[in-house]
């Protein structure tokens, strides 16, 4: 967690359909959600490297739904938004690997706590 400060992002318990959005400004986050909620994790890129899809997920507490390139569209590199669904109680570590070809450039590790 060299760059990371832990950030607890909590979602309202009554809003199980609400989307929990995690912005790209903080890396290595901890997110708390309820079963049924969707989680959007946004990661920015500088240069031609991109985050690998799907990312590595440590447990079945969440499922990977997909990834999209989202605004802002900059010449520096794409902004990627990864979408997940909280499917059962538990804790899942998500390991994002930023690759340039076969070379590892950077990693981000986020944790999702599903209540």
Regions found by a protein language model. Name each.
Residues 11-13:
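C-terminal motif of bacterial Sec signal peptides marking the signal peptidase cleavage site
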Residues 15-39:
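N-terminal edge beta-strand
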Residues 29, 80-82:
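Short strand-edge motifs at loop-to-beta-strand transitions and within beta-strands
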Residues 40-46:
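Short edge beta-strand/loop segments characteristic of extracellular beta-sandwich folds
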Residues 48-72:
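Short, solvent-exposed loop/linker segments at beta-strand-coil boundaries, enriched for Pro/Gly
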Residues 84-94:
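Glycine-centered tight-turn and secondary-structure capping sites
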Residues 95-107:
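Short, exposed beta-strand-loop hairpins at the edges of beta-sheets
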Residues 107-113:
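C-terminal edge beta-strand
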């Amino acid at each position: 967690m060299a760059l990371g400060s832990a950030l607890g992002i909590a979602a309202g318990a009554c809003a199980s359909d609400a989307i929990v959005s995690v912005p790209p400004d903080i890396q290595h986050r901890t997110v708390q959600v309820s079963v049924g909620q969707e989680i959007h994790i946004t990661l920015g890129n500088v240069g031609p490297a991109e985050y690998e899809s799907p990312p590595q997920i440590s447990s079945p507490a969440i499922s990977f739904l997909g990834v999209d390139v989202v605004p802002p569209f900059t010449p520096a590199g794409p902004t990627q938004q990864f979408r997940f669904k909280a499917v059962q109680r538990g804790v899942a570590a998500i390991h994002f690997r930023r690759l340039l070809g076969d070379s590892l450039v950077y990693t981000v590790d986020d944790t999702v706590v599903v209540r």
